[in-house]
Amino acid sequence: MAQYALEAGVSWLATSVSVVASGTWQFAKWTHKYVMQQAEELEADEPEESYFQQMVDKEKEFHNYVRQQIICMWLFMLLYLFAYWLISRLKRKTEREALYAGEEDYFVYRVSVWISSTATATSIGSLTLLPFSVIGVELLQLYDGNYYLQWLSYSLIGALWNYVFVLSNVSLFVLLPFSYFFIESQGFSTSKIGNDMTQRIYEAMAISFLFAFVLLCLAEVVLTILDYPVSFLSITSVNLPLIYSCVSFIGAVLLLISTPYGFAKMFSLARDFLVTEETADIEEENSEQSEDVTEPKNSSSDETIHQVDRSDTPHLEDVVNDITENVDADGEFRKDSDSGIESGSTEEMRLNTDDEEMGINDSDDKSAFGDDGDLGNSTPTKNKKKRRKHDYAATTPIVRKWDKDVPKKPKNPNFDYRNLKEYVKEARRQRSSLSESDDYWFGSPPRSSFSANYYSSRFSRWKHNSETGLNPSSSLLVDPFASGDFHEASSSEASSTPLSPARRTKSEEAIWKPVLHTVKSSKLYKRAIEKQGRLVKLFMSLRFPVAAAALLVLTTCSLIMVATNTLKLLFGYRSLPVYAQYIEVHTRHSFGLFGACIETLLIIYVMITSFVGLYSLPVLRSLRPVRKDTPMPTIIINSSIVLVVASALPVAVNTVGMTTFDLLGSHSSLQWLGSFRVVVAYNTLFVVLSVAFLFNQLTASMRRQIWKWICQLRCGIRRESDADETIEILRGDKKSN
C-alpha cells in the first residue's frame, strides 16, 4: 500500500514538474514572441521614415532633372532663333541660287537652312559655354542657396557641356555633310522606289556614308604612320571622344594660327575704322569753317536778299519762337476733298529740292529784284524747273518776328539753345494735332482772320510766359474751331498727340529752309557749333589712341598668362588638363567675382580675335559671308568651319592657361591633352607667333618708311654717279673737238 502511495506521489510530482516546466516554457515562448514583436515594430518604423526620405529625394531629383531639361531646351531654342535670323540675313534668296530649279529645290533649301541653323546654334553655345560656366560657378559659390539662383546648378552646367559635345558631333559628322550633299543631289535615275525627293534623300545619305568612310580610311593611314595602338577600322575600339579628339586638334591648330594673327589684325581694323573716319570728319569740319569764314564777304548781298541789317539779326530764342509759330500757322496743309491730295498753302511748296543748298525761299528771291526787274547784288542761283502750280486760294505771306514792322520781344532768361531739338519736336507735334483735326479741314474760317488771331494769341502767350519766367517751349494745343475761340491745353494733352509720319513732306522742308538758314547764321548758334566742334575734334583725336591702348592691354595680359602657364608647366607647378567629372571647389577663381569677370573678358577677346584672324587668312578670306549675297553651300561650309573652331575654343583656352576652370564632360578626355610635349609646344608656339605677328604689324609702317628712305638714298647716289659720268663724257667730247 505504501508502495502504491509512493509511486502515486512520484508520478504526481513528475506530472506537476512537467506541467510547471511546460507552463514555464510556454510563458517563456510567449514572452520571447512579445519581445520580438515589439522589436520588429520598432525596426519597422525606421525603414518607413528612411523610405519616405528616399522618395522625397527622388522627387526633388526628378523635378530638378525636368527643370534642367526645360532650361536647356529654352536656351537651345533662343540660340536657334538667333542663328536662323543670322543666316537669313546672310544667305542669298533661294530664287537666285545657282542650283535652284523649282519648288522641289525650295524644300531642299529649307531643310539645309534648318540644319545650318542647328549647327550655328551649337557653335554659339560652344562659344558662350566657358564664360557662362566661369561666371555661373562663381555665383553659385558666392551666393549659395540664393532664391534667384535656384535655376542654376552644377548639374545644369555639366548637362550643358554634355549637350554641346553631343550636338557638335551630330552636326559635324551627320547633319552638315547630309545638308551639303542634299543640295548637290539629283536622285538615282535608275531606281523606281519612291518619288524624286525620296531619291535625292537616298543619294545624299549614300554619298555622306562614302564620305565618312573615306575620312576614316585617311585617319587610319595617319594613325598607322604614328604607330597609334587604336585603329579606326576596329569598331570595338573606336569611341566618340577619340574621333572628336582629332577634330578638336584640327580646330586647335586653326586657333593657333588665327588667334595670333587676329591680335595683330585688331590694330589694323581699329586704325581703318577710326583713323579714316576721323580724317573725313576733320575735312568736313574744315570745309564748314571755310564756308563760315566766307560769309562776311557777301554781307551786302545777304542784306539785299533778306532786306535785313546784320545788326538786327534775331537771337536764337526769337528764331525758335518763329519756328513754332510758322510751323503751326503758315505750315498748314489743305486737303482736296475730291482727290484726297495734300498740298501746301505757302509759296515754299513750289520749291524744288535742288534749292535746299541755297537756304532761301521764293519770297526772299523776289525781294532781291529791283522795280525794273534787274538783279541787284544778289548771287546767281540755279535755274529752277517750272512746275504746275496748284489751283488753290492765294497764299498768305510769311510774317516773321524780326521784320521791322513787328515789335521786338524781350529775351527770356530761361531760354537754352541746347534744347532746340525739343522745341522743334514740340512745334511739329502741335502742327500734327492741328492737321489731324476734322474741323480743321471742313468749315474752316477765312485764312487771313485765322492767321491774325492765331499770331496775336501766340504772341500774347509768349509775352505772358516770358514775364512769369516760363519756358518758351511749353506746349500749346490750339483748337481754333472749338466754341469759336482759342484755348490752351496742358503739356500732357499736347504730348499725347502723336506725330504723323505722313506729314513729313517736301513742303515741310521748304517751309523750314529760311528759318534754318537764319538759325545757322546767328552768332549764338555759331558759338555753340564751335564749342561742340572742339569737343568732337577732341573725341575724334582721342578715340583711336584709347582703343589702341585697350587692345594693347588685353593682348599683353593674354600673352603674359600664356607665358606664365608655359613656365608653370615646365617647372611642374601646374599639371596637364585632366578629366574632371564633377565641378569641385578648386574651380573657384582666386580673385573672386572680379577675377572671374576679367577672365571672362579675356576669353571673349580671344574669341573675337580668333574669328577676325580666321577670316583674314588668305585661304579663308574668299569664304567670308556677304550680307544677302552668300550662297547656301558657302553658308554650310562656314557653319562647319565655325563649329570646328568653336568646339576647340574651350580646350585651347584651357590649354594655354587663360582659365582655371576645369573642362567638363568628354572635352577633358581628349587624347592629345595628355601629351606633355604637345601642350608645351602649343603654348610656346602661341607666344612666339603672337609676338612675331604683333612686331610685324606695329613696325610695318616704320619699316616701310626706312626702306623708302634707303631706296631714295640709293637712287640719289645712282643719280649723282650718273651725273658725274655724264659730265666726264661731255668733257671728253669737248676736248676731242
Swiss-Prot record:
Biased composition regions of type Basic and acidic residues, renumbered to the chain: 303-318
Residue spans of biased composition, Acidic residues class: 280-293
The UniProt entry's GO CC annotations, sorted and at most eight, read: plasma membrane
The lineage's top-level taxon is Eukaryota
A GO MF annotation of the entry reads: transmembrane signaling receptor activity
- What InterPro entries has UniProt attached to this entry? LIMR, LMBR1-like_membr_prot
Region annotated Disordered sits at: 280-416
The Gene Ontology biological process annotation of the record reads:
signal transduction
Record family assignment: Belongs to the LIMR family.
- PANTHER family documented for this protein: LIPOCALIN-1 INTERACTING MEMBRANE RECEPTOR LIMR (PTHR12625), PROTEIN LILIPOD (PTHR12625:SF0)
Q: Protein name, please?
A: LIMR family protein R05D3.2
Protein's organism: Caenorhabditis elegans
